């Protein structure tokens, strides 16, 4: 599954990406997870299965849906607690749930 995380600068989610990759490996899931600044979303959304926004750019959800909906990419804001605690397993589950419901 191709998952893209979008935050303010693309840096703050790097630890979460690592934790998600570890969780995926533990579960035997094949994932491609990369973090980008929100400003790059339009450029990198092609071929993505799920787009996740960091809580700090959650106010951009409506704009993100304008970009993602026409491409059939589900998008939502990562729950604050899971983001803050860098809970890779919960965020990975959140991504899979979004993909399943698209």
Map each language-model feature to its residues.
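Conserved active-site segments centered on acidic
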Residues: 2-38
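Ser/Thr/Gly-rich flexible loops in soluble cytosolic domains mediating phosphotransfer, phosphorylation
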Residues: 3, 74-102
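Short glycine-rich anion-binding loops that position phosphate/pyrophosphate groups of nucleotides
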Residues: 9, 56-58
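Generic structural signal for helix capping and beta-alpha/helix-loop junctions
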Residues: 13, 41-43, 85
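Short, well-ordered alpha-helices that flank and scaffold nucleotide-derived cofactor binding pockets
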Residues: 18, 22-25, 66, 93, ...
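Short acidic/histidine-rich motifs immediately flanking catalytic phosphotransfer sites
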Residues: 45-50
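Acidic beta-strand-to-loop metal/phosphate-binding motif
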Residues: 52-54
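A short, gly/pro- and small-residue-rich
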Residues: 60-80
């Amino acid at each position: 599954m191709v998952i893209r995380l979008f935050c303010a600068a693309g840096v703050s989610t790097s630890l979460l990406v690592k934790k998600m990759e570890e969780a995926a490996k533990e579960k035997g899931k094949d994932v491609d997870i990369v973090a980008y600044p929100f400003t790059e979303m339009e450029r990198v959304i092609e071929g993505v299965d799920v787009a996740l926004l960091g809580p700090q750019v959650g106010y951009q959800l409506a704009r993100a849906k304008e970009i993602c909906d026409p491409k059939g990419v589900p998008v939502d804001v990562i729950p604050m607690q899971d983001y803050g605690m860098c809970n890779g397993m919960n965020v990975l589950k959140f991504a899979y749930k979004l993909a399943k419901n698209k």
